[in-house]
Regions:
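A non-catalytic alpha/beta surface segment that caps or lines the substrate-entry region
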Residues: 1-19, 41-44
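Short secondary-structure junctions
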Residues: 1-4, 45, 139, 180-183, ...
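An extended, acidic, His-containing surface patch that forms the Zn2+-binding/catalytic region
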Residues: 3, 198-266, 272, 276-288, ...
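Short, charged/polar, Gly/Pro-enriched secondary-structure boundary elements
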Residues: 16-22, 199-201
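Active-site metal-coordination/substrate-binding segment of hydrolases
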Residues: 20-87, 93, 104-109, 368-371, ...
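A common structural junction motif
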Residues: 28, 173-181, 221-222, 292-298, ...
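Beta-strand segments within the central parallel beta-sheet cores of soluble alpha/beta enzyme folds
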Residues: 80-88, 141, 229-232, 303
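Midchain, well-structured core segments that form catalytic/ion-binding scaffolds
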Residues: 92, 98-278
Length: 395
């Protein structure tokens, strides 16, 4: 049985019963951007590697879940509950698809979203969105980044030329972690192009913020500018939120801050900031921590949104059922269920948590160029998901 829910999302379902075991994945992707070695919109296989946008986030995992359902059905296992694979189309930009699902469809009894890492995710940090605005700046234009939930890995800037400034900037950029940079001077202007390193907003320390590096180097070489000072003192190239009073951590992780997009409109520079908040901190905690630290004569920061975290106790039946499926297939008992900075459908749909398919410590280039997945890992994930569905049918 397949159902289209007003083009927000759809689902494929098998089995019978009142209760529903749900699997929720997404078909939308982030913009391509960057330099790809292969066509991002064509599946390219090189040995065990399969390249393309969405191979890991999240079209590949959706297919893994679909094949797990097929194998389970073909095995003859009695389905005492319905098993429903929900496919959304708006996860990357707000999960409006799952909000619509909640409005028009039945609540899930239990389930998972294959949009994170194995062995199991029993908590997701809270989310905070901010925008930084310039008040006074000599910067003529500055633009970079593609989405708010990824490190700004490409950025351009235009500033007024000053004697010796081009050479000073080139020397400063040479001592940074930029992959590439270019500084040119013409018609009284200096043009800067910087290429950093992409990374997901939940793990910004894995990336290099090209915009942040430009701001840092401008101040380093003596370019006097009010907004440059404001950005460097409040955001900078660190990822811990110390500049706005938000540096904190709990037993499950620390706060992270990511600058995703920089743009210039009508002479005002704005920077989108994506913050992931430790699971034990509430909205009132965060607001009080940054109170009085978001504005001065050089710039201002607006809080756009604060979303609460998700947390399931380690010993909950849902966590135990999914973790057991992972251990039974892989034999891995060293890695334990964990809390992550990423946000998934688990925050929108009730009674589910994130479960696979990524391996810990592996960079699948999600939200970056040459995103990939391994065929062998996909095959293993299918088996894990099949066992997981069996376990969920039993709780």
């Amino acid at each position: 049985k397949t159902v289209n829910l007003d083009n927000y999302c759809g689902y494929a379902e098998m089995g019978e019963g009142e209760e529903i075991v749900g699997i929720a994945g997404h078909l939308d992707i982030v913009p391509v951007g960057g330099d790809w070695s292969y066509n991002p919109f064509e599946l390219t296989r090189k040995g065990d590697y399969v390249y393309g946008r969405g191979t890991t986030d999240d079209k590949g995992p959706v297919m893994e879940a679909l094949y797990a359902m097929k194998l389970l059905r073909d095995s003859g296992v009695k389905l005492n509950k319905r098993v429903r694979l929900i496919m959304g189309c708006n996860e990357e930009t707000g999960s409006r698809c799952m909000q619509h699902y909640n409005e028009v469809a039945e609540e899930l009894s239990c389930g998972f979203t294959p949009d994170a890492s194995f062995p199991c995710i029993h908590g997701e940090k809270g989310h905070m969105g901010m925008t930084v605005y310039s008040k006074n700046t000599k910067i003529i234009a500055m633009n970079g980044g593609f989405v708010s939930n990824a490190v700004c890995d490409n950025c351009t800037a235009v500033i007024p030329a000053e004697d010796g400034l081009k050479e000073k900037l080139e020397a400063a950029f040479a001592n940074t972690k930029l992959q590439e940079y270019k500084v040119t001077e013409e018609n009284g202007e200096i043009h800067i192009e910087a290429k950093g390193v992409p990374a997901h907003a939940s793990t910004p320390t894995l990336g290099v913020n090209a915009a942040g590096v430009i701001f840092e180097c401008l101040e380093q070489v003596g370019f006097e500018d009010d907004f440059v000072k404001f950005y460097n003192s409040h955001i900078g190239t660190s990822c811990d939120g110390v500049g706005v009073g938000l540096k904190c951590q709990d037993a499950y992780g620390e706060l992270t801050l990511c600058n995703g997009i920089v743009k210039t409109e009508d002479g005002v520079i704005s920077c989108t900031i994506d913050i992931r908040v430790p699971v034990t901190f509430k909205e009132e905690d965060i607001r009080s921590m940054c109170e009085g630290k978001l504005e001065d004569e050089n710039g201002r920061i607006e809080i756009n949104s604060i979303g609460n975290p998700l947390f399931f106790p380690r010993e909950s039946p849902l966590v135990e059922a999914l973790y057991k499926a992972y251990v039974d297939v892989t034999g891995d008992t060293e890695n334990e269920p964990m809390v992550i900075g990423g946000g998934t459908y688990a925050k929108t749909l009730k009674n589910i948590i994130a479960f696979g398919p990524e391996k810990l410590g592996v960079d699948y280039r999600i939200h970056g160029s040459d995103e990939y997945i391994l065929v062998s890992e996909m095959e293993e994930a299918v088996l894990i998901y099949m066992e997981a569905i069996k376990n969920l049918l039993a709780i």
